[in-house]
Amino acid sequence: MHSQLRERIRLMRARLDNARPVIEIPAEFQLFVTPAPVCDRLVTLAEISNRDHILEPSAGTGAILRAIRDTAPGAMCDAVEINSGLVRYLRENFNGVRVQCGDFMEWQPVQYYSRVIMNPPF
């Protein structure tokens, strides 16, 4: 058993050694990344389809956007993110998603959305 655990730890360390941070986030932004299984569940519960136009009002690192893209690659997505560094990351990594930089509470959408998906418990 110990050898299996050691091997798992070694593999995790190897993955982390090759990983690079997306961006350094100052504490005042309060970034809460939703785990991938939770994102998948959110998308399933929201019954996302390729016909939907979806808003993600606090996109962060794009965890929910990734789950949407995996489930319904034809869905149109708009995202709002207050951190300009994360906005750059989202624009570079989520082609086709319209990413707005700003505070969602002050943002004025110009259209209606068929679905809004955000970090729980919101």
What is each stretch, according to the model?
Residues 1-122:
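Class I S-adenosyl-L-methionine-dependent methyltransferase catalytic core
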